[in-house]
């Protein structure tokens, strides 16, 4: 399975990105995958700093910057970054997207454990491994922080919401991850939630 690791980045998470890139370097040594980072910081300057981190950890990712309006909310900015990743998966001939957020440190065998679950059955379209919410101990976090998504889903569903086009579509971008999952399930696909397979997962906040 040809996998693209893709994640939005922003300068506000500079506190964790070098540790994350070191983690990526070790993981991709064990399970080869390409890396795409989509920056939505204010201006393109932050990319230079990220490239220095990549050089230090012998990574050669593709990094693009989206120049988005300052008034655009955080959730929409992230959604537009994910749409850029979706387009890269489709144009690059990848079989799956590994959505792995930069504030999560995972074991180097994590991806190799998720891939067989996605390949096991044709009806499994998404495999998401729960982690813990930083603010509330022992509360599961159901976002796309560590999630493997099959290409088939990305061919069908965009991350750009066309409000009013579907009566079940949310009115804001905040629950857009839940909406993506809902579309997959509504169309007969299977969304698999996994707990305990990948351990430990560190959700960084500083």
Which functions belong to the PLM regions below?
Residues 13, 38-50, 69-70, 104:
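A conserved acidic beta->alpha catalytic loop
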């Amino acid at each position: 399975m040809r996998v693209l690791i893709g994640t939005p980045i922003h300068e506000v998470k500079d506190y964790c990105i070098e540790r994350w890139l070191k983690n990526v370097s070790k993981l991709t040594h064990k399970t080869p995958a390409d890396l795409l980072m989509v920056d939505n910081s204010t201006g393109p300057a932050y990319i230079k700093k990220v490239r220095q981190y990549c050089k230090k950890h012998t990574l050669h990712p593709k990094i693009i910057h989206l120049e988005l309006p300052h008034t655009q909310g955080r959730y929409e900015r992230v959604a537009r970054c994910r749409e850029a990743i979706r387009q890269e998966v489709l144009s690059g001939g990848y079989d799956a997207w590994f959505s792995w957020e930069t504030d999560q440190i995972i074991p180097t065998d994590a991806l190799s454990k998720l891939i067989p679950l996605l390949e096991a059955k044709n009806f499994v379209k998404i495999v998401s491994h729960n982690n813990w919410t930083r603010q509330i101990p022992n509360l599961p976090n159901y976002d796309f922080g560590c999630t493997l998504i099959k290409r088939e889903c990305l061919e069908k569903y965009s991350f750009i919401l066309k409000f009013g086009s579907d009566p079940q579509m949310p009115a804001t971008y905040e629950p857009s991850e839940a909406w993506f999952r809902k579309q997959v399930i509504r169309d007969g696909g299977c969304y698999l939630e996994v707990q305990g397979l990948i351990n430990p997962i560190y959700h960084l906040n500083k």
